[in-house]
Amino acid sequence: MTDTIADIVDLDRYPIADLAAPETQALVAEAKAKLADPGYFTMPGFIRAEVVEAVAAEAGTLLADGHWHERLRESGIGLATGNYPWHRPTRAAVRCAGGDRMAANSALRQIYAWQPLTDFLGTVFGVMPYYSSADRMVGCMLTGYAPGDELGWHFDPNDGVVTLMLQKAGGGGIFEFAPKVRGGEGAVEVYDAVMDGRWPGTVSEDQDAGTLALFNGHRSLHRVTPIDAAPDRIVLVLSYDSKPGQVFSDDIRRNFFGRTS
């Protein structure tokens, strides 16, 4: 694909190339406010509707040769409980494809390489200068969830997660999060209530294809519900850092892709 960024991103709706523009400053202010509470901000239609189907097809082709892995994990929950004698594993089942498999002129890679997006995100997160990851595998990667797959309840090791929804699942695949529940008095009871569906503060978000989402998940317990029906849920995950040249460990690469290079 050789489209310009203006053909891919709806710059009329989101004029983020000009950070000084009043519309962009208003968008930044809104994003900062929503990331502060509840910790989640979306930009529906960030990718033009006429482009979404093509990028989803490209992603689906790459994921067909991707690496599927399933695991039960406790660390994301356990770390948040301190010394509480509490363990409740959650399941993660997902297929991943590395950015190094994307063509140089891929629209997916064009989005990630577009400096105004990086600058906009850094401004929103309050981290400037801000850099896209130098890791060609993990920095710009695809995740695919087929029927039966899911991303169980967990906390992120850091805030500032950036994702782009390329294709909604035919059923299930809803993003759910419980804002700011990490730690504190009675944490275990809160976690159990969230995971049992009894917590009144849980938020459900059903993103449409083309939506850019920003999320602070370090203190918010969150998950993607099991996929119930085709088509697959396909998401582009974008990584950034406050320092240039950031790369991920071989263990992380192996976990995602079953390979290190």
Question: Where in this protein do the model-derived segments appear?
Answer:
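Non-heme Fe(II)-dependent double-stranded beta-helix
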Residues: 2-26, 36, 45-116
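A structural signal for well-ordered alpha-helical scaffolds and beta->alpha junctions
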Residues: 28, 114-118, 159, 217
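Short strand-connecting beta-turns/loops that link adjacent beta-strands
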Residues: 48, 158, 171, 229-230
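Short beta-strand segments enriched in hydrophobic/aromatic residues
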Residues: 59, 166, 240-242
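A generic secondary-structure signal for well-formed alpha-helical elements
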Residues: 63-67, 125, 244
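Catalytic core of non-heme Fe(II) oxygenases with the double-stranded beta-helix
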Residues: 102-104, 109, 118-212
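Catalytic core of Fe(II)/2-oxoglutarate
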Residues: 175-180, 184-261
